[in-house]
């Protein structure tokens, strides 16, 4: 929930009634002030005569009272247009003031640009916003000039955000490129597809809220090929850096010490994972090799058993005919001996 909604809920009810009463009073009191502000002394928003009529509620709640200020500006412009018969040369200026008031009422995206155009700190932009609205009520000429100043300040702010985003996304190029002589703008650095996400975003919009309302972590740091190559070279010789060496590398690569330290931590963790993966692969290969050797040994044992069985069967068949021949010869000798027995 933004601060604007909190202020809307805290705003007292009599504040709107007070401004509705002032709406009809300003139609008669702001017209002479518009004529008196045509002098050089009344053209500045800080010394405008209408700034004295700022209500305390408008000082406390400048965002909520903006709509009432726009109504006051429209009423003042109508009053000036009605009295155009007294000063004929001011009628065209009053119509331009009316158009500027309507444009300011419809376009609320320039509420912070008045402070940037006047080289004022962002803390005073809230006060300058209320003074700018009273300046629309009091001075018609400065109203048209403030619209052009607001558009110019928007361009300046966009260029500032573009340079800030470029410096954050690519610190190497922002560090290595010196300022151009003669006050000329530095040429744009090459933009890559992954850098265009935060190109035209303000620093406040770059904070992304998560689903539970908490801000998410910042995006990962992108390193160039040169930076990655130098870091890999250093990691090849030293897995751990000393403080002095870390400072030297950070200065040489236009990075911070924290980025160097985090990169080396991640690289050591990556090496540890790679070694663990290689160890697991070697262990799996060793198991497969042992399994193959065991299977081969079992096959050899089976083959040896089969060979032994075949050899024993062949040897047994070779001894059986010899035994049968011996039995036959023994039987014939026994018959001969029996036949020779005397009677």
From Swiss-Prot:
What Gene3D superfamilies has UniProt attached to this entry? Answer: Homeodomain-like
Compartment(s) of residence = Nucleus
**Record keywords, A-Z:** Developmental protein, DNA-binding, Homeobox, Nucleus
Q: PROSITE patterns under this entry?
A: HOMEOBOX_1 (PS00027), HOMEOBOX_2 (PS50071)
Main location group? nucleus
Q: Which residues bind DNA?
A: 216-275
- Report the GO terms under cellular component: nucleus
**Which residue stretches belong to region Disordered?**
29-54, 286-343
Tagged with keyword Lyase: no
Give the top-rank taxon of the lineage listed in the UniProt record for this protein. Eukaryota
Against InterPro entries, the record matches this protein to: Abdominal-A, Antp_homeobox, HD, HD_metazoa, Homeobox_CS, Homeodomain-like_sf
One GO term in the molecular function aspect is: DNA binding
Q: Which Pfam families match?
A: Abdominal-A, Homeodomain
Basic and acidic residues bias (residue ranges): 286-305
Query: What does this protein do, in the record's words?
Result: Sequence-specific transcription factor which is part of a developmental regulatory system that provides cells with specific positional identities on the anterior-posterior axis.
Recorded family membership: Belongs to the Antp homeobox family.
* Name of the protein: Homeobox protein abdominal-A homolog
Q: Which organism is it from?
A: Tribolium castaneum
